């Protein structure tokens, strides 16, 4: 029935000129052809399409059959039917109006979701390439439309991260990346072969957009296999190499992009790139920078005369982009790029003026976020080691400036303790090696004003700030032991009265208040233990106006005793510091009396 219906429509249209075909004819042709496929009359449909007398009809109306044929192929019919469907598809690509066929193919690419995205892309890429190459004009627009549609669909696929996931390629992204490169190659070659052609200049712009989109997705999040392994088996490395190769071929080599990024005058004239640079290009260029400096792809294109500090300056804004993201796969690349850039520098060689550049302060603050908020321990430790490496590379004034910045902005006791330990290390170097004005005298006293104080005086939450307080006390103990009152190299003894008023006395008061509070809570908890055990439930304890999360009574007691132990520890160090101050002051007084 469906075959007869289709033949009837064709017979009626054979006597008409192409421009006389009605909209109704198109609809009836599509409906009858679709029924032929659904009812299994694929061989008869193939014969109708192969008939030379139907060539004009197929040219005008045949593109309507592409959708049903493609869906038939994706359903996976028996082998002979599948082969006939492929023959029909090839004939439609060969005979149909390329403009209509292009739109039909792109609509089909936009339809699916999930794992079907890669299936249909892999099926349609080669026909899509053929159709575009047949277009008489506006090829640049068509290539851009196709690449944009393909990228939009591929960006929906999850990026595999582990070696096992890459090899399994469950969603087909790796296969699609490889196929997409093959799809793009002829158009790149077309740009190279005739650079003076105005249409090719537009085509170059579309290819440039595609390359930057590819650098953002999937390459921004993609993980790469170890370089010692067979690089040919790493689909993302191969994709990255091809993209960087395309950029060079169309006139935008790696040095031009990396060395000119961020300048007022761009290396390209395309308006969209000018307007969207900060939003769209930042992540793409960051991705490119990572590929070049960490993965070594295209690094041979860079001039060898660039200084390590200049390269660091180039990379810092890209590192900032990486660290602003919350995805582990992305900000871990920022850590790698930072490490690669810093290891090129000598210790203490990075001039303090670099901290006047926004990214040079934003990056260490980004590292603090990784150290304090990242759920993965290895990355937290990596962030800590990168912050230490960055500190090591700064000159003395740079270290001093960064310490002040971190103490004012980190709002994290552990980070502040880390900074205070670094301050102690710098003071120690000033004692043991060359006198350093930034960690002695007036400059150091200004820094100690930040360190040897309680954020909220006696009301400070000592438990929450225990890391910082212990580090501050240890620094003060070190200074008292190391610096004699007569020498007063650090300026400590001159400022001792202020330190006692701003730090030691409020700390005493805070400790007494905190210990009394926690001891009362322990007593209450112990009294309530019997009731809680009878109820076989959980109890709650309120500390500092905030309720400790529900937990068994035994666990709450452990938490309270642990807090009390922390206060005892702080108190013992505080007592030792005050004892040392008294001994040192008494010793100096006796010496002065002896001299008189």
Curated annotation (Swiss-Prot):
Disulfide bridge map: none
Modification N-acetylalanine occurs at: 2
Molecular function terms, GO-annotated: hepatocyte growth factor receptor binding; signaling receptor binding; ubiquitin protein ligase binding; ubiquitin-protein transferase inhibitor activity
Entry note about domains: The C-terminal half of the protein is important for interaction with RBX1.
Subunit structure: Interacts with FKBP4 and FKBP1A. Interacts with RBX1 (via RING domain). Identified in complexes that contain RBX1 plus one of the cullins CUL1, CUL2, CUL3, and CUL4A. Identified in a SCF complex composed of CUL1, RBX1, SKP1, FBXW7 and GLMN. Component of a SCF-like complex consisting of CUL7, RBX1, SKP1, FBXW8 and GLMN. Interacts with unphosphorylated MET and is released upon MET phosphorylation.
Reported modifications of this chain: Phosphorylated on tyrosine residues.
Gene: Glmn
Entry-linked Pfam families: Kinetochor_Ybp2 (PF08568)
Coiled coil ranges: none
Lineage: superkingdom: Eukaryota
Phenotypic consequence of gene deletion: Complete embryonic lethality. Embryos are present at the expected Mendelian rate at 10.5 dpc, but all are dead by 12.5 dpc. Mutant embryos display decreased growth, delayed neural tube closure, incomplete axial turning, pericardial effusion and a failure to form an organized, functional vascular network. Mutant embryos have reduced protein levels of FBXW7, RBX1, CUL1, CUL2, CUL3 and CUL4A, due to increased proteasome-mediated degradation, and increased levels of CCNE1 and MYC.
Location of the region described as Alpha-helical region with structural similarity to HEAT repeats in the Swiss-Prot/TrEMBL record: 2-555
UniProt region (Important for interaction with RBX1), positions on chain: 299-596
UniProt keyword annotation of rRNA-binding present: no
Protein's organism: Mus musculus
Tissues with expression: Ubiquitous. Detected in embryonic vasculature and embryonic perichondrium, and in adult eye, brain, heart, testis, kidney, smooth muscle and skeletal muscle.
GO cellular component: Cul2-RING ubiquitin ligase complex; Cul3-RING ubiquitin ligase complex; Cul4A-RING E3 ubiquitin ligase complex; cullin-RING ubiquitin ligase complex
Alphabetical UniProt keywords: Acetylation, Phosphoprotein
Example GO BP: circulatory system development
Function: Regulatory component of cullin-RING-based SCF (SKP1-Cullin-F-box protein) E3 ubiquitin-protein ligase complexes. Inhibits E3 ubiquitin ligase activity by binding to the RING domain of RBX1 and inhibiting its interaction with the E2 ubiquitin-conjugating enzyme CDC34. Inhibits RBX1-mediated neddylation of CUL1. Required for normal stability and normal cellular levels of key components of SCF ubiquitin ligase complexes, including FBXW7, RBX1, CUL1, CUL2, CUL3, CUL4A, and thereby contributes to the regulation of CCNE1 and MYC levels. Essential for normal development of the vasculature.
Protein's name according to its UniProt entry: Glomulin
UniProt entry tagged with the keyword Phosphoprotein: yes
